[in-house]
């Protein structure tokens, strides 16, 4: 399996890398990939969780591709926000990759959508203000 992931032509397997190195790798990437398990047990366990890796991918500057079961909360979020190329059926993977190969502007479009999503929904100052407003509203 590692040979498939690390063919040194199209894909590179880095193993464990530091957060600083991850940023450098994202800078050199066309796609930031977020993958969740399709195993039923793991899918059910993680279906309500929102991985911090999603935010990392959205901030990467690359187009985001999410390959996850459709019951996953993070996948639903990315799909609703149209912030990522979303694949919930592994049978769609090859067709999606061929579409990207034939229309590379898809990656530019989704990199922009990821950036717009980060600005709209993941601004720490804006989120802090919203939380403070909620506390004030419910404290009265």
Question: For the regions a protein language model found, what residue spans apply to each?
Answer:
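Conserved acidic donor-binding segment of nucleotide-sugar-dependent glycosyltransferases
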Residues: 51, 69, 80-91, 99-105
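Alpha-helix boundary recognition
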Residues: 5-6, 26-27, 58-59, 79, ...
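The C-terminal output helix
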Residues: 138-140
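Nucleotide-sugar-dependent
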Residues: 18-27, 32-55, 64-76
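Acidic, glycine-centered active-site loop in nucleotide-sugar glycosyltransferases
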Residues: 45, 59-61, 71-88, 113
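Nucleotide-activated donor-binding/catalytic signature segment of Leloir-type glycosyltransferases, i.e.
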Residues: 1-28
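Hydrophobic anchor at the start of a short beta-strand
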Residues: 11, 64, 84
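A charged, aromatic-enriched C-terminal amphipathic alpha-helix characteristic of glycosyltransferases
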Residues: 88-91, 95, 105-136
């Amino acid at each position: 399996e590692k040979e498939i992931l690390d063919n040194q032509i199209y894909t590179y397997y880095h193993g464990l890398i530091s957060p600083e190195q991850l940023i450098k790798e994202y800078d050199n990437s066309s796609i930031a990939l977020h993958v969740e398990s399709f195993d039923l047990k793991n899918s059910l366990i993680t279906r309500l969780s929102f991985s911090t890796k999603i935010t990392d991918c959205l901030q990467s500057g690359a187009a985001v591709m999410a390959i996850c079961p459709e019951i996953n909360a993070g996948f639903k979020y990315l799909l609703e926000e149209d912030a990522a190329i979303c694949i919930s059926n592994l049978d769609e993977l090859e067709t999606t990759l061929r579409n990207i190969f034939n229309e590379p502007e898809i990656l530019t479009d989704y990199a922009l959508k990821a950036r717009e999503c980060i600005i709209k929904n993941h601004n720490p100052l804006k989120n802090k203000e919203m939380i403070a407003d909620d506390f004030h509203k419910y404290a009265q």
